[in-house]
């Protein structure tokens, strides 16, 4: 029996490539989401009080920005998203740029290769930053984006300043004991 004209590849031939792609995405999602803290812990009203000294404020801001880094990033990005709802073209541009950042920088395990040459991740970072700032500068939402970033940063800094840090590491130890 001849097999002329039939496709010899089985559907499983694509499995290793697909597994490689999804493995990279899953590792990055896990590492990024692993640092996201529960919103209930972040907004626990019993963990707020006003500090008496400036040194305490600085210490709290440093500790909380490291501990709640992913949550704070989500807050600022949500602020930018809300500011762009009234400017749909800029919102689409921002979403396209976000996709480009994810594809070219964040979800990449190996260096970017163009014409059989590896591009260093710092070069990609610089080029993507320049392109992002240039494109957002050309949209009509410059003021909206600037105000949203400042508002998000003020919300983050005010939360970080009044959120007590004594229970942060205790909670980390408890969760590490539960999940060895």
From Swiss-Prot:
A GO BP term, please? Answer: vesicle-mediated transport
Q: Where are the transmembrane segments?
A: 63-83, 84-104, 123-143, 145-165
Q: In which tissues is it expressed?
A: Expressed in hypocotyls, leaf bases and shoot apex.
Q: Give the Pfam families listed for this entry.
A: PRA1 (PF03208)
**Membrane topology per record:** Multi-pass membrane protein
For this protein, the record's InterPro entries field holds: Prenylated_rab_accept_PRA1
GO cellular component assignments = endoplasmic reticulum; endosome membrane
Q: Which UniProt keywords apply?
A: Endosome, Membrane, Transmembrane, Transmembrane helix, Transport
State where the protein is found: Endosome membrane
Q: Does the keyword Transmembrane helix apply?
A: yes
**Function of the molecule:** May be involved in both secretory and endocytic intracellular trafficking in the endosomal/prevacuolar compartments.
What's the subunit arrangement here? Interacts with PRA1F2.
Q: What is this protein called?
A: PRA1 family protein F1
Name of the gene this protein is made from: PRA1F1
């Amino acid at each position: 029996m001849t097999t002329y004209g039939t496709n010899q590849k089985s559907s499983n031939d694509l499995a290793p490539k697909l597994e490689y792609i999804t493995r990279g995405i899953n590792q990055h999602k896990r590492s990024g989401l692993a640092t996201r803290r529960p919103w209930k812990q972040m907004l626990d009203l019993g963990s707020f009080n006003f500090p008496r000294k400036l040194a305490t404020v600085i210490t709290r801001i440093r500790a909380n920005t490291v501990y709640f880094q992913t949550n704070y990033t989500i807050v600022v990005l949500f602020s930018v998203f809300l500011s762009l709802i009234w400017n749909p073209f800029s919102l689409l541009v921002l979403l396209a740029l976000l996709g480009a950042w994810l594809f070219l920088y964040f979800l990449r395990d190996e260096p970017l290769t163009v014409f059989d040459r590896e591009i260093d991740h710092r070069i990609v970072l610089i080029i993507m930053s320049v392109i992002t700032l240039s494109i957002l500068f050309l949209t009509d939402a410059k003021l909206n984006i600037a105000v949203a970033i400042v508002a998000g940063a003020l919300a983050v800094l005010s939360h970080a300043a009044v959120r007590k840090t004594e229970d942060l590491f205790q909670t980390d130890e408890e969760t590490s004991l539960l999940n060895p």
